[in-house]
C-alpha cells in the first residue's frame, strides 16, 4: 500500500492492541477515578476519619511467574499500594498501605485466574442519552415516546397520551405527571413554564388537585415517592425518605455519565457543562419540548435509529474492570467501618494499616475479581485451539451480558447488518445459532475511541487542501461523523493510479449507496480488507462465495487443530503473517545478538556482552486440549536482528499462519461414499502423518480429610488390585514420566480411610474392640483411573502440596491422533464434511501422470451452496504446486477488470502446463478439468473431473471425543428415562421420526422394547438385564411403564379416570383391574 515513497502509507494496526490499550487505561485512569470517589469514613462522634488518596498509588511486580501461576492454579496478580490518612483526635497519620491484589494482563492480552487463561471481550450497548420513536397503536393513531437511558442502563420514558397529558414512566408499571417529576427534581411551576417552548400545553392538563401537589418541592417528592414506591396512606416528609428515593431512582435512572451528557447536549441542543453528569430538570423539560414538537408537527419527525453505531458504545476491558474495582472499594468501605467500631470497643489505637486488615481487604479485592472472571458472561475462558483463535477472541464484540440483549428476546432488526457497521464491525463473522448477529468481530482496521466508546474506521482524506498539498492524510471517522462525508466505496487500493480519471465512482452517503462524480468525493477506503474481520480476511476469493458460507468458513478456521507437520497455504490473502505474529505463539527476538545454543527448552542469546536465556514452550496443554509447542529455528552461531523469528509455535511456518495442508482433491462422485458432504480420503494421509495432531489431556486428583478426621493417602500399596494395573506407579503411588497408559490403568493410587459399621464387624474384630477399645478401620480404594479414550504417553506430573493433608496431583497425557473415519474436515469456503471411508492409495482415482488423489469431494456441494471460491483456489493451488509458487491475493480483484480471478487462474494453469510439459494441466476444451482414471480398474472416467490443490483443515470435532455407547446407566428422577449426553453416560434418544421409521417396517417387538423395557419400565429393565447376562428368555410384563403412569395421573387431574381390562382368551370374560 505504498505510493511515491511514504505518501498514502497505511499499516494494519496490532490485532491485540484493543485489549492492551483498555488495560493501560484502567491502570492509569480507572483506578484513580474510583479512588477519588472513595468517601472519607467518619465515626458518628467525628473522633476518627479515614481517607484514601488517588494520587501516588503503586503496583508491585507480580510475585510469581506466569508459568507457575498456570501450573499451581494461582491468580497472576499485582499488589496495589495506596496512600491513606487517619485522623484520630488530634493525631494525623499518613501511611502507604496495601489494599489487595489486582489481576494483571499478560503479553497475550489475557488474565490468569486460578491457573486458567481468561479474556474479557468487548460489550456493545445502547449509549446513555435520549431516544425518540413513533409507532401506531391498534387504532392507527401515532404514539410518540422519548426514552432516557442512564449510564447504569436504567430506563425512563416520556409519553403523551390521547388526552394530550405528558407522563413520565419511571418503571414498567408506575407513571407520574411530568410536572410532579420536574418539581421533585427541584423546579417550581414558574421555572417550568419559563423554560419550555409550549407553556400553554403544560398549563392545560393539571387540575386544581394536581396543582396542589406541586406547590412545593416537599409535596412533589411525597407524591413522587407515593407513586414510585406504590405506598398508600398519609406520608410525612423526612430525610430518610429523600435518601431512599435518591438511592432507588435518581442514582440508577438519572446518572447520565460523561457519554450520556455529551449525547443529551447534542440531541437537545443544550449547553450544560460536561462535568454535570446527572439528569437535570432542564434536560427533562427540553426532552418534553422536543416530544411535543414531534406530536403537534412543529418539530422534526426524526425517529432515532437504535441500531446505528452512533447510538451505541463499547464497554471495553477498562470499563468492566473499573466497575469491579468500584464494587470492591464499596465493600472495603463497609469493612473499614466495622473495623472502626471494633477499635472503639477494644479501646486500642488504630493505624491506617490496622484498619485495612488483610482479612477484610486483600481478600475482598481479589475475590471480587475472581468472582467477576468466574461468573460474568463477558469474561470467558481464552480459546487456545490455534493461533487464529488467540488473535480473534480479544476482538469479539458482544451485545449479550448485563444491560444488553438476550439470545431469546433479541429482534431481527437488532441482529441485522447495519450500514454504519461498514469498516467497523465485520458483516460476515458472527456466531451460528441462537446468538447469530448478537456477537460480532471488529473489522481489521477498526479501533475503539476509549474516551467516548465509539468504533472508528480509517479513510483517506481527498479534500481540496489535501489535493493541493499532494498528500493523503489518514483520518479516523466515528459513526456520527462519516454521515457528513461522501465516501468512495470501490477503487479502494492506493496502487490504482488511474482513479482520478474515472468520471463516476460508487460511493456511500448517509447510509445510502450512490454513484457520483469523483470530484465530489471527500474520503475513500484505504484497503480492500477494511470491512472484514481477521477470519473473513483469511478467505481467498471471498468475493466469489455466498456470505453464509463465508461465515461458516471464518468460524471453522477457528476450530482447526494444529497439525504435527504444519504447511503454509499455496493460495492466501497476505494477512497470514500478521495474524501469526499478533497471536504471540512464535518467539521474536527483542534485541539483536548471536545465538550461543538452542534446544527444545531454551535459546541462549549473547547481546551487548550479556547472555540472555529465552525459555520455550514445550508440549504445553491449551484450554482446548491441543498441544502448544515451540520449535527453535535458528542454528548455533547465527547472528540475528531485532524482530527476527527465533522459534515457531504450533500452526505457524516461516512466521505465517499454517492451519491445514495443501492436498490434491478431485470433485467427483465415488460409489456414493461422498454423498451429502461425506469425504473420501486416501490412506496416504494416515500413513504419512499428513493430518496427525497431538492432544494433551489433564487428569487430577486431590487428597482431603474425611468426616472422621482421617486423612486420605497417596500410595502404591493398594490391596485387592491386580498387579498389572499398578505397573506404571513409582514408589510414591504416582505414574512414572514416559509411561504408556491404557484405559483403566491407575494413574495415582489413593486410599480413603473408612470406619467399619457395627454390622460388618467379624467376631475377632468385635473381641478386639470389647477388650482393648480399638476401632477397626478399613480403607476404600479411590484411585485416579484413566477413563475410556484416554490412552497415551505420560509427559508431565505435577505434585502441588499446600499443606500436609492437602495434596493435588496432576497428570498430563499426550495423545497422537491420526485422521480416521468420523473426523470432520473443512476447506476455507464453508465446504465441510465427515470422513466416510479411507481407501488404499492404489484404489484412489489417479491423474494422467500417475499421482493418486488425496481427497474426493462431492461436486453437488458447490452449485447449491454458491461457494465458487473453492474452485478458484483449488485450480490456482495446482498451478502454484507445479510452478513452486505461493500466491497472496487481495479480494475484489474484479475492480481492475471483468473476470480478473478467472483470467489469473487460467493464465497460471497455462504457464504450469507449459513449464511442466503436461498438456493435461490446462486443456482449452475444459480448462481446470482433466481426464482421470479409476484406480481399481485403470479405466478413464466418462467425464473430465475438476482437480486441484486445496488447503484443507482438520477440525477439533473428532470422532474420538464423540463416539459413545451405553448398556445401562443413570436415569432421570422425574421420568425414569435414560439421561441425555455423553458426559453423563446418557442414552440414545429415539425420537418421533425414528418411531415412525420403525412403525413403517412393522417391528412391534423392537418398538415395545425401545419405548418401554429399555426406557422407563422399572421392573422389566432389571429383569431384561439379568436375562441378557444369563442367556435366558426375555420375560413379558403386564404392568405399565412410568410414562403411562404419568399420563394416567395427568388425566386424573382433568377428572378423567382411566382403567384397563384383561380379557380372558378362553371364555372372553372381562376382568376389571385398576391401573
From Swiss-Prot:
For this protein, the record's InterPro entries field holds: DNA-dir_RNA_pol_bsu_ext_1_sf, DNA-dir_RNA_pol_su2, DNA-dir_RNAP_su2_dom, DNA-dir_RNAP_su2_hyb_sf, RNA_pol_bsu_bac, RNA_pol_bsu_CS, RNA_pol_Rpb2_2, RNA_pol_Rpb2_2_sf
Q: Which UniProt keywords are given for this protein, alphabetically ordered?
A: Chloroplast, DNA-directed RNA polymerase, Nucleotidyltransferase, Plastid, Transcription, Transferase
Reaction(s) catalysed (UniProt annotation): RNA(n) + a ribonucleoside 5'-triphosphate = RNA(n+1) + diphosphate
BP terms from Gene Ontology? DNA-templated transcription
Give the location in the cell.
Answer: Plastid, Chloroplast
Q: Which PROSITE patterns match?
A: RNA_POL_BETA
Principal subcellular localisation of the protein: plastid
Q: Pfam families in the record, alphabetically?
A: RNA_pol_Rpb2_2 (PF04561), RNA_pol_Rpb2_3 (PF04565), RNA_pol_Rpb2_6 (PF00562), RNA_pol_Rpb2_7 (PF04560)
| Keyword Membrane belongs to the record | no
Cited HAMAP family: RNApol_bact_RpoB
Entry similarity comment: Belongs to the RNA polymerase beta chain family.
Function (record text): DNA-dependent RNA polymerase catalyzes the transcription of DNA into RNA using the four ribonucleoside triphosphates as substrates.
What NCBIfam families does this protein map onto?
Answer: PRK00405.1
Protein name per UniProt: DNA-directed RNA polymerase subunit beta
